[in-house]
């Protein structure tokens, strides 16, 4: 494992923990897209089905289990424990516009036409767009709390570091995963505008990050 992948995993874990603790400590999920969190839980579920069929390393297994537990715990906080604070009206992105194309593409573009491989491919494609309901919600409300912005920052860093990981592996091993790389590029592009707003507004000390309201 190279430093880029390890750093990416750490950023990913930090992002999920930031979100979980934000909801738990504030006893509120205001400003958080439950739809994005459900999509991320679905990403982990379909990607980590190999937990039951193969073993790579203790690190790999532990990280998969932690991601699954935190993802479903976060979904539980949003839709059950603190459901009264969930803003379903603002969280109005039509997720079927993501799920249907992603499902279709995973059947058409994969490395092997087997159930586990198709589901793995589905998870890669879905992860690249799973953040869209959250970004849509922020745009719709016009602002994001700084802690939510920190969560998105670490998610973006995770994705960018994984792109560096793929470049490093191609340079040192000649290994290239087209599906993962293309999906990672797409996902990183979605974060670019957010990165600009984060560094120009949140780091200046504002408690919230204001965004342009949709017309």
Curated annotation (Swiss-Prot):
<feature type="transmembrane region" description="Helical">
    <location>
        <begin position="59"/>
        <end position="79"/>
    </location>
</feature>
<feature type="site" description="Interaction with the K-D-E-L motif on target proteins">
    <location>
        <position position="5"/>
    </location>
</feature>
<feature type="topological domain" description="Cytoplasmic">
    <location>
        <begin position="136"/>
        <end position="149"/>
    </location>
</feature>
<feature type="region of interest" description="Important for recycling of cargo proteins with the sequence motif K-D-E-L from the Golgi to the endoplasmic reticulum">
    <location>
        <begin position="204"/>
        <end position="208"/>
    </location>
</feature>
<dbReference type="GO" id="GO:0030663">
    <property type="term" value="C:COPI-coated vesicle membrane"/>
</dbReference>
<keyword id="KW-0813">Transport</keyword>
<keyword id="KW-0931">ER-Golgi transport</keyword>
<comment type="function">
    <text>Receptor for the C-terminal sequence motif K-D-E-L that is present on endoplasmic reticulum resident proteins and that mediates their recycling from the Golgi back to the endoplasmic reticulum.</text>
</comment>
<keyword id="KW-1133">Transmembrane helix</keyword>
<dbReference type="GO" id="GO:0046923">
    <property type="term" value="F:ER retention sequence binding"/>
</dbReference>
<dbReference type="GO" id="GO:0005801">
    <property type="term" value="C:cis-Golgi network"/>
</dbReference>
<feature type="transmembrane region" description="Helical">
    <location>
        <begin position="179"/>
        <end position="199"/>
    </location>
</feature>
<feature type="topological domain" description="Lumenal">
    <location>
        <begin position="1"/>
        <end position="4"/>
    </location>
</feature>
<keyword id="KW-0472">Membrane</keyword>
<dbReference type="GO" id="GO:0005783">
    <property type="term" value="C:endoplasmic reticulum"/>
</dbReference>
<dbReference type="GO" id="GO:0005046">
    <property type="term" value="F:KDEL sequence binding"/>
</dbReference>
<dbReference type="GO" id="GO:0005789">
    <property type="term" value="C:endoplasmic reticulum membrane"/>
</dbReference>
<keyword id="KW-0256">Endoplasmic reticulum</keyword>
<dbReference type="Pfam" id="PF00810">
    <property type="entry name" value="ER_lumen_recept"/>
</dbReference>
<feature type="transmembrane region" description="Helical">
    <location>
        <begin position="33"/>
        <end position="52"/>
    </location>
</feature>
<feature type="site" description="Important for recycling of cargo proteins with the sequence motif K-D-E-L from the Golgi to the endoplasmic reticulum">
    <location>
        <position position="193"/>
    </location>
</feature>
<feature type="site" description="Interaction with the K-D-E-L motif on target proteins">
    <location>
        <position position="117"/>
    </location>
</feature>
<dbReference type="GO" id="GO:0015031">
    <property type="term" value="P:protein transport"/>
</dbReference>
<feature type="transmembrane region" description="Helical">
    <location>
        <begin position="93"/>
        <end position="110"/>
    </location>
</feature>
<feature type="topological domain" description="Lumenal">
    <location>
        <begin position="53"/>
        <end position="58"/>
    </location>
</feature>
<feature type="topological domain" description="Lumenal">
    <location>
        <begin position="111"/>
        <end position="116"/>
    </location>
</feature>
<keyword id="KW-0653">Protein transport</keyword>
<keyword id="KW-0812">Transmembrane</keyword>
<protein>
    <recommendedName>
        <fullName>ER lumen protein-retaining receptor 3</fullName>
    </recommendedName>
</protein>
<dbReference type="GO" id="GO:0006621">
    <property type="term" value="P:protein retention in ER lumen"/>
</dbReference>
<feature type="transmembrane region" description="Helical">
    <location>
        <begin position="150"/>
        <end position="168"/>
    </location>
</feature>
<dbReference type="GO" id="GO:0006890">
    <property type="term" value="P:retrograde vesicle-mediated transport, Golgi to endoplasmic reticulum"/>
</dbReference>
<feature type="transmembrane region" description="Helical">
    <location>
        <begin position="117"/>
        <end position="135"/>
    </location>
</feature>
<feature type="topological domain" description="Cytoplasmic">
    <location>
        <begin position="80"/>
        <end position="92"/>
    </location>
</feature>
<feature type="region of interest" description="Interaction with the K-D-E-L motif on target proteins">
    <location>
        <begin position="159"/>
        <end position="169"/>
    </location>
</feature>
<feature type="region of interest" description="Interaction with the K-D-E-L motif on target proteins">
    <location>
        <begin position="47"/>
        <end position="48"/>
    </location>
</feature>
<dbReference type="InterPro" id="IPR000133">
    <property type="entry name" value="ER_ret_rcpt"/>
</dbReference>
<feature type="transmembrane region" description="Helical">
    <location>
        <begin position="5"/>
        <end position="24"/>
    </location>
</feature>
<dbReference type="GO" id="GO:0000139">
    <property type="term" value="C:Golgi membrane"/>
</dbReference>
<feature type="topological domain" description="Lumenal">
    <location>
        <begin position="169"/>
        <end position="178"/>
    </location>
</feature>
<feature type="site" description="Interaction with the K-D-E-L motif on target proteins">
    <location>
        <position position="54"/>
    </location>
</feature>
<keyword id="KW-0333">Golgi apparatus</keyword>
């Amino acid at each position: 494992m190279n430093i880029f992948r390890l750093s990416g995993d750490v950023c990913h874990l930090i992002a999920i923990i930031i979100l979980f603790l934000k909801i738990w400590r504030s006893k509120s999920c205001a400003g958080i897209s439950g739809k994005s969190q459900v999509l991320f839980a679905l990403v982990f579920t379909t990607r980590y089905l190999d937990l039951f069929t193969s073993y790579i390393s203790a690190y790999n297994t532990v990280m998969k289990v932690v991601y699954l537990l935190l993802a479903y715990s976060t979904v539980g906080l949003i839709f059950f424990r603190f459901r009264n604070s969930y803003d379903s009206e603002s969280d109005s992105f039509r997720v079927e516009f993501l799920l249907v194309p992603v499902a279709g593409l995973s059947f058409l573009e994969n490395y092997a036409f087997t159930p586990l491989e198709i589901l793995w491919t589905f998870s890669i494609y879905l992860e690249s767009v799973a953040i869209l309901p959250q970004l849509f919600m922020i745009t719709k409300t016009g602002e994001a709390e700084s802690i939510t912005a920190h969560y998105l920052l670490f998610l973006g860093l995770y994705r960018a570091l994984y792109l560096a990981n793929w470049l490093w592996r191609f340079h040192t091993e000649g290994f290239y995963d087209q599906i993962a790389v293309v999906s990672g590029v797409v996902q990183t592009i979605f974060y670019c505008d957010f990165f600009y707003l984060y560094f120009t507004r949140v780091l200046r000390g504002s408690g919230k990050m204001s965004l342009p309201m949709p017309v």
